[in-house]
Amino acid sequence: MMLEGYTVQPPQSTLIGDIEIQDENANQEVKNVLYQGVQKGIKRLEKRQRRVALGDVTSQKANKIHNAIHNKFHQTKNNFEIENIRSSALVKEQQRDVRHEDSDYFLIDSSEGSSTDDEQVNEDAIDDLLSRRVNDQQIQADEVYEDFDGEMQDVIEEDVDSQIEPLSPINNDEIQTELDRAFEKYFRSVPNPLDDDTHDVVMVVEYASDIFYYLRELEVKYRPNPYYMQNQVELTWPFRRTMIDWLVQLHFRFQLLPETLYLTINIVDRFLSKKTVTLNRFQLVGVSALFIAAKFEEINCPTLDDLVYMLENTYTRDDIIRAEQYMIDTLEFEIGWPGPMPFLRRISKADDYDFEPRTLAKYLLETTIVEPKLVAAAPSWLAAGAYFLSRTILGSNDWSLKHVFYSGYTSSQIIPLASLILENCKNASRRHHSIWKKYFDQKHYRCSQIVEEWIVSTEA
């Protein structure tokens, strides 16, 4: 069943990119070329210094020493593989020849079709790509992930036409009754003097209920169309997963906030809900969304030079700036999507802000960004599902009225979501490799390992 308010309608007929691939075999070749930038991209990525998040401006010398030590430590071969989603330099060069000069220069109206000259450019570019492909058949295997090439082949061969039905919480009279009971028991019009939050000015307890009521409105207002992929000509859900895998690694290298990553994915999905994007411009959309989100959420955000370097000069500073302008204009400057992190912190209040379930929930929550069924899911619901599952893994199987009050969801609404998250955590190193690898680190308390071991123990 489709979500209320959404129907499958063609978006505005605009294609990002100046060359449309007409020949099916040629299009397959371009998709194959898509994965050949892996080795170069990650080597350049690994050489970059890590950004010190929220660094003290008075300790720049200490930061330089830290970065020097860090870079020396990371001279070994990288443990992360990156999907550098890009077309060949030849195709990009041909695109620049036919760019528009206005603010939409990197866009082409799909209703206009391709001119004879453009078709000739396509044929020449593809012929060159095919000849270069014959001379470059060997791709080095990933040390950490030996089946990486096999996974990429699975992505190409996957049935991209299969229908993805979005998942959403159920609502009925019984659920509403339980929500009302929780509200009556725990809602206070006057702050509780025995609550520590009451005496913390940062928590603004007088306005907490109003704030989260407003955030619940925003999460509905800024949700993407869950069926937008049906209107994309060249993109598929597997390509979106590959893009997110790359963005997760870029986000990790820059040491950005979790809110920045979630907002980046929301911007990408909302933009794709309104515009049709070609494959050779998909990476530009992703990096521009990250740039926008970082400006919105961070104190220290990546510079244009940082992003151009990470893209291995596939795109220029001007490309990113113009793409940023166009995307913001398309979204009508509405980028204040709340994301799941405020809701996760709110729910943890039911357990007196217990560190363990909230930390484990961060890993489970991040895995949801690659799931097509959860593209339009409310972030408050995703946070509740991740927290519910984390408590279950840690041995707490109850979901009290207090949890219902602070989350806004009953256990019957959350269980289907928690089941989907758990299913996606099986064979996690293949389904969301970068997220799994990131949370396997001691810095993140090896959360992905904890989940893996729990799954094995329950299935034994």
Swiss-Prot record:
GO terms for biological process: cell division; G1/S transition of mitotic cell cycle; G2/M transition of mitotic cell cycle; positive regulation of mitotic spindle pole body separation; regulation of mitotic spindle assembly. SUPFAM superfamilies: Cyclin-like. The keyword Cell cycle applies. Keywords: Cell cycle, Cell division, Cyclin, Mitosis. InterPro entries: Cyclin (IPR039361), Cyclin-like_dom (IPR013763), Cyclin-like_sf (IPR036915), Cyclin_A/B-like (IPR046965), Cyclin_C-dom (IPR004367), Cyclin_N (IPR006671), Cyclins_cyclin-box (IPR048258). Gene3D superfamilies: Cyclin-like. GO terms for cellular component: cyclin-dependent protein kinase holoenzyme complex; cytoplasm; microtubule organizing center; nucleus. PROSITE patterns: CYCLINS (PS00292). One of its GO terms (molecular function) is cyclin-dependent protein serine/threonine kinase regulator activity. It holds the Pfam family Cyclin_C. Present with 98 molecules/cell in log phase SD medium. Belongs to the cyclin family. Cyclin AB subfamily. Essential for the control of the cell cycle at the G2/M (mitosis) transition. Interacts with the CDC2 protein kinase to form MPF. G2/M cyclins accumulate steadily during G2 and are abruptly destroyed at mitosis. This is G2/mitotic-specific cyclin-4. It comes from Saccharomyces cerevisiae (strain ATCC 204508 / S288c) (Baker's yeast).
